[in-house]
């Protein structure tokens, strides 16, 4: 498995809405993530800085990257753009983090 971590932002007035939407994640999006080899996906919120920290284990970079082109992912990004900063293609603004330590 490949471990990934990245940060995103959530709008200061949208913390609760972001959480609500993820409490009711679409089953078809969950299915696409799993079908593309995503495991142990977690997102954490830093309320003071409006930051989201995400971790996920993936089976391959190619399969992970392919999620973005699925119809359900495109719809989810469009749905989420009002609660978080997004790119012109509606994908969330994000920055991948480099792993500097891991204890198995």
Curated annotation (Swiss-Prot):
Main location: cytoplasm
SUPFAM superfamilies according to UniProt: Dimeric alpha+beta barrel
Pathways involved: Carbohydrate metabolism; L-rhamnose metabolism
Documented EC number(s): 5.1.3.32
InterPro entries reported in the protein's UniProt record: Dimeric_a/b-barrel, L-rhamnose_mutarotase, Rham/fucose_mutarotase
Localization in the cell: Cytoplasm
Record's protein name: L-rhamnose mutarotase
